[in-house]
Amino acid sequence: MFKKARILFFCFALTQCSETIDLMDRPIHKTDSTFQNEDYRLLPMDGSHNTRELGGYKTTDGKSIKWGMLFRSDKLSDISKADQAYLQNLGIKKIIDFRSKEEKAEDPDIVPKGISYIEMPISVDGAMRSKIEAVLKGETNKEVKSFLIDANKEFVSDYNGVYGDFLKNLIDDDGPALFHCTAGKDRAGFAAAITLIALGVSKEDVIKDYMKTNQFTEERIEEIIGQIELMTLYQTDAEVLRPLLGVEREYIETAFQTAEDEYGSLMNFIRHGLNISDDDLQKLRTKFL
């Protein structure tokens, strides 16, 4: 029973859309200013649930991130043919996958033709699965939160090399990029955060983007909780899983504080912790601003 619950969470796909979204109804932000606003930030996808546009955010010096150049997402293992065509129409040139080897073996990405696939594994999967199993056996909400707080510390201290390579990879060509993990919230959330900080977006606006996961996945979180309770015959209070299924401000603030404590500032972390040069930063800003 616990194994089934684990699979439900990590697949993050208890049900699929019964109808395919018409390709003609999907926004292309880069070429149509009608869609360049918050109402269209979440992309309409059949087989993913947290795929979104990072364009439009303002920097502290008055510039804006270009629309249609940078996307974050959850896993792409269930996307439809129409989804694949949509990603191609968006002009995405590369997909960067932060999932572990085990996650990718279980749910391999469907990569549309003409799009490069790049693996940059961050292996928190095994620990996450153990935590969920422990939760279903009676751990508290507080103990659940501590796992993701610790994970965000590790993004800074243990996986800075991966995130540095990620930022450098974004600037090695001129094309749009999409990056993702499993749920599109923790590993991808930190990747989005450091990218936005490097581009000059304020910390508060970065946190607002981070927190949008809860808004965009609210219905699915409720569905997952209900399904787990049903599968365990209501012998488990699946509510204690809520901190794992969504995001909390404390998670990303912990990552920021860890970086600031060690490096003095977030920009120092990007320069010295991620080994991003001033030339790299200029190239990043030229591409995305």
Short names for language-model regions:
Residues 17-177, 191-289:
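Cys-dependent protein tyrosine phosphatase-like superfamily
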Residues 3-9:
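Sec-dependent signal peptide recognition
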Residues 1-2, 22:
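General helical secondary-structure elements
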Residues 180:
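Catalytic nucleophile loop of clan PA
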Residues 2-3, 15:
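Generic cytosolic/nucleocytoplasmic N-terminal low-complexity/intrinsically disordered segments
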Residues 10-18:
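Hydrophobic h-region of N-terminal signal peptides that target proteins for export
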Residues 183, 187-188:
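Ser/Thr-glycine-rich phosphate-binding loops at phosphate-binding pockets of nucleotides
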